[in-house]
């Protein structure tokens, strides 16, 4: 059974990084409902959803696909250009370690997933 790793929405998601979009307020309750629907869709497709807890101090951490590039045999932990994203790495590494060998991009390298 495929595994889908997700993370609950941070209460600080309204402070997330945006690079080119005009900011409109994010309704945390709506974001949580949308994320629950996303997880339900993954489960309906046959995935076992492994949900990580929210990271209250990491607004962007719900976007787990940015923290690693996962291939068949290895997971590559990214080193995002935004310093605010780099503290997401330890929990993603722990979540991926049971499923893949894990390697990491180190300074001065920069890789953004997604």
Locate the predicted segments by residue.
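The feature marks the mature, well-folded catalytic cores of soluble enzymes
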Residues: 1-114
């Amino acid at each position: 059974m495929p595994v889908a790793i997700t993370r609950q929405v941070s209460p600080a998601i309204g402070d997330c990084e945006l690079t080119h979009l005009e900011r409109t307020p994010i309704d945390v309750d709506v974001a949580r409902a949308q994320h629950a629907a996303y997880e339900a869709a993954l489960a309906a497709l046959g995935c076992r959803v492994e949900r990580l807890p929210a990271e209250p101090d990491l607004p962007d951490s719900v976007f787990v696909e940015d923290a690693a590039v996962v291939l068949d045999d290895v997971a590559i932990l990214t080193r995002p250009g935004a310093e605010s994203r780099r503290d997401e790495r330890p929990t993603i590494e722990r979540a991926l370690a049971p499923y893949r060998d894990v390697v990491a991009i180190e300074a001065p390298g920069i890789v953004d997933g997604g």
